């Protein structure tokens, strides 16, 4: 009895530790590099143990994706082959919604049948969860109202992010060759950049997930501006370049002004990263007020110009044309008149 309890306890601990230690890794499947999530976990829903195996398997659908037979096909395939990795669903990754699968199947199966193929059994829709009865993801949910724990990937000490060894070509891209331009934190810069998010954050980690992508993990402390909800937790910032500009190091406390793209927070060369000072919070708020005033002024001018153009029709440009002189009347003399006035001499 005691032995059975001990075995059960050890098994429970093994499973619990295994779940907590389940690794998340950067998405490396080329077809899925531009999904709203950039971190996945293996094995996936099709039981591929590595992304390399998943890449070989998903390649068979590249032509189908390229012909764009369905607007949700790529999303569905990536949700199956590179499932989103979140802390709450490490043991059982989130599946795509049944409706997404059905849309992709109904859109693309007629084309597949033209080439004597049918929708594969491995991608059957019957076993997938329904949106209102379980947890699942769809393109609409991510764009509009997806919960924070799904939209923003937590990278906490409980989750290990595996660093992939750099390719030979990537190793040649030495950081020393990158020359980052310093962007000064001024009002003029703020007005011209018109960034979509401004945050106070602490740099937690910087990792390269490919030759042309760097992921900077930051711990968000304050949010001064955002175009979409930003959680006050650890979030990834994506640099889609071989150069990490602006150049930052772990443990730095900074103010970041940059842009969002496809629901991903970016960290680009023309963005501003400044060592944190308390004065910067007041400045950023004042700058945002000036930016809004500038927008209101421009809108008011456009409205005024529109009203003026409607009330006063446009006048013709240039000088009015001069009146044409009356054409002189020609004194046409008939032959008989000519004979009378100019009689021939006899």
Curated annotation (Swiss-Prot):
Residues 1-18 form the signal peptide. Residues 294-303 have a biased composition (Basic and acidic residues). It comes from the Eukaryota. Residues 178-307 form the NTR domain. Glycans are attached at residues 38, 68, 116, 194, 240. Residues 19-139 form the FZ domain. Keywords: Developmental protein, Differentiation, Disulfide bond, Glycoprotein, Secreted, Signal, Wnt signaling pathway. Gene3D superfamilies: 2.40.50.120, Frizzled cysteine-rich domain. GO terms for cellular component: cytoplasm; extracellular space. The keyword Secreted applies. InterPro entries: Frizzled/SFRP (IPR015526), Frizzled_dom (IPR020067), Frizzled_dom_sf (IPR036790), Netrin_domain (IPR001134), Netrin_module_non-TIMP (IPR018933), TIMP-like_OB-fold (IPR008993). PANTHER family: FRIZZLED (PTHR11309), SECRETED FRIZZLED-RELATED PROTEIN 4 (PTHR11309:SF7). Soluble frizzled-related proteins (sFRPS) function as modulators of Wnt signaling through direct interaction with Wnts. They have a role in regulating cell growth and differentiation in specific cell types. SFRP4 plays a role in bone morphogenesis. May also act as a regulator of adult uterine morphology and function. May also increase apoptosis during ovulation possibly through modulation of FZ1/FZ4/WNT4 signaling. Has phosphaturic effects by specifically inhibiting sodium-dependent phosphate uptake. This is Secreted frizzled-related protein 4. It comes from Macaca mulatta. The lineage of its organism: Eukaryota, Metazoa, Chordata, Craniata, Vertebrata.
């Amino acid at each position: 009895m005691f032995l059975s309890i001990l075995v059960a306890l050890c098994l429970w601990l093994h499973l619990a530790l295994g779940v907590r230690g389940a690794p998340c890794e950067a998405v490396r499947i080329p077809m899925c590099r531009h999904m709203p999530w950039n971190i996945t976990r293996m094995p996936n829903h099709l039981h591929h143990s590595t992304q390399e195996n998943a890449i070989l398997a998903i390649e068979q659908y590249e032509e189908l994706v390229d012909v764009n037979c369905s607007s949700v096909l790529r999303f569905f395939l990536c949700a199956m082959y590179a499932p989103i990795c979140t802390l709450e669903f490490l043991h059982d990754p989130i599946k795509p919604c049944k409706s997404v699968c059905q849309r992709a199947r109904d859109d693309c199966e007629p084309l597949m049948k033209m080439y004597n193929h049918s929708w594969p059994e491995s991608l059957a829709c019957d076993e997938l969860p329904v949106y209102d009865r379980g947890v699942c993801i769809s393109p609409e949910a991510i764009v509009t109202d997806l919960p924070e724990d799904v939209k923003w990937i937590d990278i906490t000490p409980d989750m290990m992010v595996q660093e992939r060894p750099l390719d030979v070509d990537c190793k040649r891209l030495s950081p020393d060759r990158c020359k980052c331009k310093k962007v000064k934190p001024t009002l003029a810069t703020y007005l011209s950049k018109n960034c979509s998010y401004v945050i106070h954050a602490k740099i937690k980690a910087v990792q390269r997930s490919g030759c042309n992508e760097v992921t900077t993990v930051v711990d968000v402390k304050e949010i001064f501006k955002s175009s979409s909800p930003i959680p006050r937790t650890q979030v990834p910032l994506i640099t889609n370049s071989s150069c990490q500009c602006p150049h930052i190091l772990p443990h730095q406390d900074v103010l970041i002004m940059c842009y969002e793209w496809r629901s991903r927070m970016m960290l680009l060369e023309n963005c501003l990263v400044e060592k944190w000072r308390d004065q910067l919070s007041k400045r950023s708020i004042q700058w945002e007020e000036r930016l809004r005033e500038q927008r209101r002024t421009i809108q008011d001018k456009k409205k005024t110009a529109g009203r003026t153009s409607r009330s006063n029709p446009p006048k013709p440009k240039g000088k009015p044309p001069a009146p044409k002189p009356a054409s002189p009347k020609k004194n046409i003399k008939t032959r008989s008149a000519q004979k009378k006035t100019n009689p021939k001499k006899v």
